[in-house]
Amino acid sequence: MITMKKVLYLFFSVFAVCCSYSKAQVANEDKHRLIVTTDLGGTDPDDVQSMIHLLLCSNVIDIEGLISSQVWIDDPDKTAKISEVVEQFGEVLPRLNKHAEGYPGLNQLRAIIKQGQPVSNMTGVGSGKDSPGSELIISVVDKKKDQRPVWLAAWGGMNTVAQALWKVKHTRSEKAFKKFISKIRIYDVLGQDDAGAWIAKNFPEIIYIRNREVYGWGPSDQWI
């Protein structure tokens, strides 16, 4: 079990390493835009560790979404688990701000924590199945004043990203859809549902980095 004491310990441990880096700042226009979909809150601690690492690097990345996602089975809303890690980040934020500029404030992070699809796999994608997470993805990519591409990093399942693509595909012209997908980049840690395969097969023009297998786990055929 990941307790808040352990989370704080991890924050301070990684913070100690971060302090050894240069104070050189990254200009806003040079930062990568990022939305993360994550199944944080499950039995494995890996996404908690990844979230801590990400937040400690958030002065050099524009984090624009933290979305609670499904994997291959229906799972309850775990946005509260993401919020717990963000609140613990707030405990070390004053110290981080002494060493580097550019960290997002707590309210900024709180506002971008969203729930993704409530139903797993492609069953959760289609007409009338929009979620706060899929709507956030669309609104972030649509920002007209920011032409930097948006990276979508999937630490869990891909069906919230799939829902965003499904909606734009079915509600806009082909030209507008092409413009939309030209602004996204996807990194899929591992196909943890069938939605990633659906995206890759239906939209091959999307820049999509896919891990199709990892040691000790071979996804089923429909996932790859």
Regions found by a protein language model. Give the residues of each.
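Bacterial Sec-dependent N-terminal signal peptides
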Residues: 1-26
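N-terminal acidic, glycine/proline-rich low-complexity segments
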Residues: 25-224
